Design a protein with these regions (language model features):
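C-terminal-of-GTPase-core extension/linker across diverse P-loop GTPases
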Residues: 237-441, 572
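Catalytic P-loop NTPase motifs of RecA-like helicase/translocase cores
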Residues: 88, 158, 184, 212-213, ...
């Protein structure tokens, strides 16, 4: 046998796998790659550098103390810093961070701002905030009592007002920051309106008071009038809005809800904290609060009998605010800027402050910062204002839950949320998603309303489409980590009690915009969701995108999904033609989205089409004839007419002033009293379209003598669905219908249920709505921007020219009080606005600055072809 000839292919050179590994091991032989070529065998760790982190983040109080304060909701204040672009929200936040953190990054000699809450690199480069970023700071009031202040720094640019909406939903109060020199601007106005719509109290910080001294060089008396004028304008806006939306306190420095600040120099005070400063320095034996009330308004100091009266003394004197507050402030500024060491020393000595000799060698700004922060101390006046005028997380819970929860008020869950009960069922309202460092997934940021959320806990994630009847939009996820989000670093916690803001890992997969988290095993009653965010603007600018390399389409689609999560108001959709479109609020918003899409979320080269705008379809007359349509089986016939809605009604429906969920009597009374409808029409409203807050109405205008109401009622849902489908995409160019009232004037419905199925009725209802619409002189509507332009007076004619060339028109040009600038207010069609800002800067040599925000819809001139 040994001499047997063995063929080459049968020769055995190596032992078999079974001989090597033994009979207990299964061996598989693959002769082909399981893994695609473009996928690496060992994945590299992706870490995209898009955020500014911080290694050393030690605070003056221990993190255990901060976490301990979270458990006492009556010591927690949740606020959002809101206001106009470049009014100093982020720098004001810097001042608070500097007072609570040991920060090597805060260099007293540096003249640059850290902008601590501008965590993204592009925010630092553009020098504006793009995302709302929260911080939880332990601040002390004037009695050295500690409070946990959860503060959200929001963007001031009108394009990013969706971030402000998300922040206000989580907050219990709004801190309105206003530039002392510029006063109330477009976004200040919108922030006031938005805060009042969210039923939040407002306190004001008048920031950049130093601009009145150093830039505008106003005398103290004029500075007082400028500040007073700003406060009056704010109050006018508050009273104008709150007359329709509930009661909000007016702003009054004497009441303590105004704080004056110069955040760049690190100082802030309220009249109350300034009064305490005087009491401490001079040992005056009366209450600080009483003195503070006399430091504002037409009050004068009489030195002969040391009293403060409304009547000025015979010798003449300035008002108390000018004499006691502004003059010392002016004195410090003028002497430090004048670099006269002796007089600075003498003035600071009056405030009980002595600086080391080395301090006087500093540049002007660092010296100002050092002197003023020592004179005014920490921001205890600001904390006092928050404590006194903004309710604690516990006290605010009832108003917050009433405004945001969609469920019934007599439930156990509702009561637990109102009581801020840590032992109650878990309810968390998530309104923001923040990307992880590799941008592959997101962490959800929300507010715990009741119960406690813990790491390792399984929760139900209820999306915006969830209801107890339709549970499709619900998933179960495990909470893997929890943090207190501190802008540039995160504080890990194992549990978050009610009233606190928390960043949650592990639940983001099914969340698109907002969500409600609740216990998995809570079965005692139905859980309802928190209302989705109600934005104060619309995404009307759209652009189409496609990948440069068509094979990378799946990557781009995944990136678009992440964009939709990251930007609260961005809408991404696929058109019938197959192109992917993104809708945003303006050019800067879309620019920011495209940067994120290319660099963070899809990492592919993307081609972008020229921006266009969304249109709406409407009618301007009643239908010229009754329009009918028969169902395909010829057994049903529906007749309709269309006519325009009354002026202002569409806005009322969209703003939630009237709701289809009201009972028929309340709904009827509203339309009867406000819009003069007759009782029959007012009581026969079937639906708003294309959704519950849609600007179109469907009415049943049939008479019981002519139509069988029982049969019509049987197909009501199908007709409503057909109407809403039609209203979502109109007959002219598939854009939503707006401002149209559809009336059913006749209907012949088959008595047998078999012949009146939804498959027959829905398309027919849509067809008849279309024909009624087309018979009523249809028109297109385009979105129109409200534009606010800041400019010197000599550029006015150039601005008028640029606007008129783009179909815009000026509604007002008014001088900005106390400054050499003018404010031009104008309307500009959005489709004409692309490149407007560049054009404006070119024609005014860069002196004019404009901001545009969606205002209303207007009919496009001309008849659509």
């Amino acid at each position: 046998m040994d001499n047997q000839v063995v063929l080459a292919e049968d020769k055995k050179y190596y032992p078999t796998a079974e001989e090597v590994y033994g009979p207990g091991v299964e061996t598989l032989v693959n002769d082909e790659d399981e893994q695609p070529l473009e996928q690496p065998i060992i994945k590299p760790v992706r870490n995209i550098k898009f955020e500014v982190g911080v290694k050393d983040s030690s605070t003056y109080v221990s993190s255990q103390f901060l976490v301990g304060l979270m458990s006492n909701p009556s010591l927690v204040r949740n606020v959002a810093l809101v206001g106009h672009l470049q009014h100093g929200k982020t720098v004001f936040m810097d001042m608070l961070v500097e007072q609570t953190h040991h920060m090597p990054t805060f260099d007293i000699n540096s003249e640059k701002h850290v902008r601590y809450t501008d965590t993204r690199i592009d925010e630092q480069e553009r020098r504006i905030s793009i995302k709302a970023v929260p911080m939880s700071l332990v601040l002390e009031d004037s009695n050295s009592k500690s409070y946990l202040c959860n503060i959200m720094d929001t963007p001031g640019h009108v394009n990013f007002s969706d971030e402000m909406t998300a922040a206000l939903r989580l907050a219990d109060g709004a801190v309105l920051i206003v530039d002392a020199a510029e006063g109330v601007m477009v976004n200040t106005e919108r922030a006031i309106r938005h805060a009042i719509q969210e039923q939040l109290p407002i306190v004001v910080v008048i920031n950049k008071v130093d601009r009145l001294i150093t830039e505008l060089k106003l005398p103290p008396k004029d500075a007082y009038h400028k500040l007073r004028h700003t406060i009056e304008v704010i109050n006018n806006h508050i009273s104008a809005v709150s007359s329709t939306a509930g009661n909000v306190k007016v702003i009054d420095p004497a009441a303590g809800n105004v704080c004056f600040a110069g955040a760049t120099a690190g100082w802030s005070f309220t009249l109350q904290s300034f009064a305490r400063l005087y009491l401490k320095l001079h040992g005056i034996p009366f209450e600080a609060d009483k003195f503070a009330t006399r430091l504002w308004g037409d009050m004068y100091y009489h030195p002969e009998d040391r009293t403060i009266k409304k009547k000025p003394p015979a010798s003449g004197a300035e008002r108390t605010f000018v004499q006691f507050v502004l003059e010392p402030l002016y004195k410090i500024y003028s002497q430090v800027i004048g670099e006269h060491k002796k007089s600075v020393e003498a003035t600071l000595a009056e405030f009980g402050v002595t600086l080391p000799n080395s301090a006087y060698k500093l540049n002007v700004r660092p010296l100002l910062r050092m002197a003023l922060s020592q004179v005014f101390g920490s921001a205890s006046g600001f904390t006092d204002m928050l404590v006194k005028h903004i309710p604690s997380a516990k006290d605010a819970a009832a108003r917050k839950v009433d405004h945001t929860y969609t469920g019934p008020k007599d439930s156990i869950v509702y009561q637990a949320m109102v009581d801020c009960d840590p032992a109650g069922p878990l309810m968390v309202n998530v309104t923001k998603l923040y990307p992880k460092s590799d941008c592959s997934s997101f962490d959800a940021f929300g507010r715990v309303i009741s119960g406690k959320i813990m790491t390792g806990q399984s929760v139900k994630v209820l999306g915006e489409g969830y209801s107890p009847e339709d549970e499709e939009d619900m998933t179960v996820k495990e909470v893997t980590k929890l943090w207190v989000y501190q802008a540039r670093y995160r504080l890990p916690v194992s549990m978050a009690p009610p009233g606190s803001w928390v960043l949650i890992e592990g639940v983001d997969a099914s969340i698109m915009k907002t969500a409600t988290l609740c216990n998995v095993n809570y079965n005692e009653e139905d859980i309802y969701i928190f209302r989705s965010l109600q934005f104060n603007t619309l995404p009307v600018v759209k652009t189409a995108t496609e990948p440069l390399n068509p094979s990378e389409l799946p990557k781009m689609v995944e990136g678009l999904r992440k964009i939709s999560k990251s930007y609260p108001l961005a809408i991404t959709k696929v058109e019938e033609s197959g192109e992917h479109t993104i809708l945003g609020t303006g050019e800067l918003y879309l620019d920011s989205i495209m940067k994120d899409l290319r660099e963070l979320y899809s990492e592919v080269e993307v081609k972008v089409a020229d921006p266009v705008v969304s249109f709406c379809e409407t009618v301007v007359e009643s239908s010229s004839m009754k329009c009918f349509a028969e169902t395909p089986n010829k057994k049903n016939k529906i007749t309709m007419i269309a006519e325009p809605l009354e002026k202002g009604l569409a806005e009322d429906i969209e703003n939630g002033i009237v709701s289809i969920d009201w009972n028929r009597k309340a709904l009827g009374d509203f339309f009867k009293t406000k819009y003069d409808w007759d009782l029959l029409a007012a009581r026969s409203i079937w639906a708003f379209g294309p959704d519950k807050q849609g600007p179109n109405i469907l009415l049943d205008d049939t008479l019981p003598t002519e139509v069988d109401k029982g049969l019509l009622g049987a197909v009501k849902d199908s007709i409503v669905q057909g109407f809403q489908w039609g209203a979502r995409e109109g007959p002219l160019c598939d854009e939503p219908i707006r401002n149209v009232k559809f009336k059913i004037v006749d209907a012949r419905i088959a008595p047998e249920p078999l012949h009146r199925g939804s498959g027959q009725i829905i398309p027919t209802a849509r067809r008849v709505a279309y024909s009624a619409f087309l018979m009523a002189t249809p028109r297109l509507m385009e979105p129109v921007y409200y534009v606010e332009i800041q400019t010197p007076i000599d550029c006015l004619t150039a601005i008028y020219t640029v606007l008129s060339r783009r179909r815009g028109h000026v509604t007002a040009d008014v001088p900005q009080p106390g400054t050499p600038a003018y404010i031009v207010k104008a309307f500009l069609p959005v489709i004409e606005s692309f490149g407007f800002e560049t054009d404006l800067r070119y024609h005014t040599q860069g002196q004019a600055f404009s901001l545009s925000v969606f205002d209303h819809w207007a009919i496009v001139p001309g008849d659509p072809p």
